[in-house]
Structure formats: C-alpha cells, structure tokens
Amino acid sequence: METIAQHRHARSSAQKVRLVADLIRGKKVSQALEVLTYTNKKAAGLVKKVLESAIANAEHNDGADIDDLKVAKIFVDAGPSMKRIMPRAKGRADRILKRTSHITVVVSDR
C-alpha cells in the first residue's frame, strides 16, 4: 500500500532540498526520521514534516503499521519562482529569483 504526502511551494530551492531527499530514499521511516533530525539543513525540517505527514496518512487512511513502512519514493520538483528587485548602484536593478519547490514523499509497506 503506497501513501503520498506533498508540500507544494516550499520556500527552498529544489537543488537544496534534493541534497536532503537523497539521504533518506529507500530507508525505513524510523531511520529516515532519525537522519533528518540530525541533519543540519533548513531543507531537512521541510522534508521531515512531509515524511511525518505521509506516515500519519498511512496510519490513519490506510491502517498501515508504522514499523513496516519505508520511503518508497521521494522526489523534489521545482515550483514557481517569485521575482524580486534588488537595487544596485547608479540607478540600476537586478532581478532576484526566490525559488520554491514541490516535495513529494511516498511511503510503502512493501
């Protein structure tokens, strides 16, 4: 039984979140939560919340046993970028892209 949780428009770039996602792909959820707890990155907190949501979804909606769950799939897609202006010297301006990402975690008992 596969259960999905998503965080859309997460305020971190997909490139940064993928570094954390690669750490937990294929692991048991208990081990993945432990890794995320001690990973010193902002993205680790975002991924941890999505993983906890997926675990809760599996338990509540599908009646799955938490001890059997593992991270079947985790992928991070780029979301929309917010365009901002940063003033520069001599009346010029640069465009700043505040990137977002869509984090998807799939847990499975197989």
From Swiss-Prot:
Entry-linked PROSITE patterns: RIBOSOMAL_L22
Disulfide partners: none
Keywords, in A-Z order: Ribonucleoprotein, Ribosomal protein, RNA-binding, rRNA-binding
SUPFAM superfamilies the UniProt entry points to: Ribosomal protein L22 (SSF54843)
Molecular functions (GO terms): rRNA binding; structural constituent of ribosome
Coiled coil regions, renumbered to chain: none
Gene Ontology annotations for the cellular component aspect, listed alphabetically: cytosolic large ribosomal subunit
Pfam families per UniProt: Ribosomal_L22
Biological-process GO terms, alphabetical: translation
Description of how the protein assembles with itself and partners: Part of the 50S ribosomal subunit.
Biological function: This protein binds specifically to 23S rRNA; its binding is stimulated by other ribosomal proteins, e.g. L4, L17, and L20. It is important during the early stages of 50S assembly. It makes multiple contacts with different domains of the 23S rRNA in the assembled 50S subunit and ribosome. The globular domain of the protein is located near the polypeptide exit tunnel on the outside of the subunit, while an extended beta-hairpin is found that lines the wall of the exit tunnel in the center of the 70S ribosome.
Membership in a protein family: Belongs to the universal ribosomal protein uL22 family.
Xref: NCBIfam families: rplV_bact
Protein name per the record: Large ribosomal subunit protein uL22
Source organism of this protein record: Sodalis glossinidius (strain morsitans)
